[in-house]
From Swiss-Prot:
It comes from the Bacteria. Transmembrane segments: none annotated. Catalyzes a trans-dehydration via an enolate intermediate. The active site is at 22 (proton acceptor), 99 (proton donor). Substrate binds at residues 73, 79, 86, 100-101, 110. Homododecamer. InterPro entries: DHquinase_II, DHquinase_II_CS, DHquinase_II_sf. GO terms for biological process: amino acid biosynthetic process; aromatic amino acid family biosynthetic process; chorismate biosynthetic process; quinate catabolic process. Keywords: Amino-acid biosynthesis, Aromatic amino acid biosynthesis, Lyase. This is 3-dehydroquinate dehydratase. One of its GO terms (molecular function) is 3-dehydroquinate dehydratase activity.
Length: 144
């Protein structure tokens, strides 16, 4: 089993960007924890971060046939990107949407997700653990 892990805009700034909201772990820390969990589960992951909406769409489109599922934190694109939503729908792979913070308990403009209707589930509000819970969720879903 191989899972594509996608990190959206500004996640490269984790550890220094608003740690009171997003925590003190860096993206490298999160990727290392995901890699360890993947090893424990006996699966492969490939992690990719970009600040570009188009590059995220390209990676999602190229995932079909190469990956069994997608774990995605679309970050700010959650609330704006119909293009990412449509790419996930077209890829026809199971996807889990994750967020470090609880997007439903933040500013009103952050509460709507264009991605969630295309995902098998959404996990948010657990900091870096949202990613680990998301990886376990997609693993269990595909394994069924």
């Amino acid at each position: 089993m191989k899972i594509l892990v996608l990190h959206g805009p500004n996640l490269n700034m984790l550890g220094t960007r608003e740690p009171e909201i997003y925590g003190s772990l860096t993206l490298d820390d999160i990727n290392a924890a995901l890699s360890q969990l993947a090893l424990d589960l006996g699966i492969e992951i490939e992690c990719f971060q970009t600040n570009s909406e188009g590059r995220l769409v390209d990676r999602i489109q190229s995932a079909a046939g190469l990956f069994d599922g997608i774990l995605i934190n679309p970050a700010a694109y959650t609330h704006t990107s119909i293009a990412i939503r449509d790419a996930i729908a077209a890829a026809a792979l199971p996807a889990v949407e994750v967020h470090l913070s609880n997007i439903h308990n933040r500013e009103k403009f952050r509460t709507k997700s264009y991605i969630a209707p295309m995902a098998i589930g959404q996990i948010c509000g657990f900091g870096a653990d949202s990613y680990l819970l998301g990886l376990r969720a997609i693993f269990n879903h595909i394994k069924k």
